Amino acid sequence: MMQNIKDEAYKTYQNVKDEISSHLPQSAPEPTGPPFKCAIFGCGGINFGTAEGPWNNSQKLELVLGHRLQVVALLSPHKSSHERVLKQKAETEYASSYANTREFYSADEYLEYLDSHPEEKPDAYIIGIPPETHGSTQKGADLELAILKRFPDASLFIEKPISAAPVEDAFAVARRLPSESVISVGYMLRYLKTVQKAKEIIKEKNLKVVSTVAKYNSAYIHNSKKFWWIMSESGGPVVEQGTHFCDLSRYFGGDVEIDSIKVNRVEWDDPSGKLNAMPVDEKTIPPEERIPRFTAASWKYKDGGVGAFTHNITLQGAKYDTCIEVQADGYYLRIVDLYEEPVLYVRSPDSDEEKVYKYPNDDPYYSEFKIFLDAAEGKGDKNLIHSDFLDAVKTYELTKAITEAK
């Protein structure tokens, strides 16, 4: 029975993957210019792709920079991870971008190397490592500050979650960042054309947001990374996964009154919390470390509106179900299917019929990296970056508060 479920889910995944790929840009005109040096921290899925979605930071670097890309350093604690990644890249059209990559096994080792070889300073640092290893002022988790202490004008692309430290410690990092640095945090959904169109409508019509409602229904059967199912390692599904929709909620609604947050959950041991196609053996996880199946949260925004958010771990197969709604006087804006084929529906005072906005082949990951890399190179305005470190810490604060609410 379990194998049949997994087999069917895998077939669904392959179909969805092919469909997604057909809508993403596969190539771009070859960029021209001098070599652009990148150091990549982490050999995991966010930097080099997974079966679960279109995220793949190295691929976006290749698409934006073309053969200008030179990956000068690759960091991971495991030699086998280096070998796997470099072997894969050696078989692609961008093999030359990885031909002279130096391998390092810790941030300290790499930064000490740069101390004695400052001429090898990269043009950008791509940080896609577990949150407990960065985003803090504490030794061993102070990667951003360690880099910027040496190179105050460094350009850092940092994946979410921004930290695993206490929230105040993450805010302390934000306060210590030099103004000349260029920092972008990987909340790519902000770059969707549907999201930007919704923001444009709100601004043009001078609307005050009354409410946001965000829904994230996760497909879990392929999520076999055990750490994801352990609260203390992943931070929980809201911090690790639902963060994108908490972030979009803030993007539309503004800063949150943290003390106003109210939460209800379906826990793993509730009658409706049993999952029949678990990809990991949950018996090996201590009961107090098991994650909730459903989380519902609500809060007040500082501007007076109300936010609501739900995260659900019940879908099988591969396709996620996502939606965010924004309401203001006379206007109802709704964006659906944000990971695959986003569509914006807008009802306005002009008509009860919704106006539909679609943007085929929109790749927010590409847009995100294009803006960041242009800013890093001095060709673009860093104010065009939609998510900086401080803003990402505010999203982290919201997700932590939801996770820790009793």
UniProtKB/Swiss-Prot annotation:
Keywords: Cytoplasm, Nucleus. SUPFAM superfamilies: Glyceraldehyde-3-phosphate dehydrogenase-like, C-terminal domain (SSF55347), NAD(P)-binding Rossmann-fold domains (SSF51735). It is found in: Cytoplasm; Nucleus. To S.pombe SpAC12C2.04. One of its GO terms (cellular component) is cytosol. GO terms for molecular function: nucleotide binding. It comes from the Eukaryota. This is Uncharacterized protein UNK4.17. Gene3D superfamilies: Dihydrodipicolinate Reductase, domain 2, NAD(P)-binding Rossmann-like Domain. InterPro entries: Gfo/Idh/MocA-like_OxRdtase_N, Gfo/Idh/MocA_Oxidoreductase, NAD(P)-bd_dom_sf, OxRdtase_put_C.
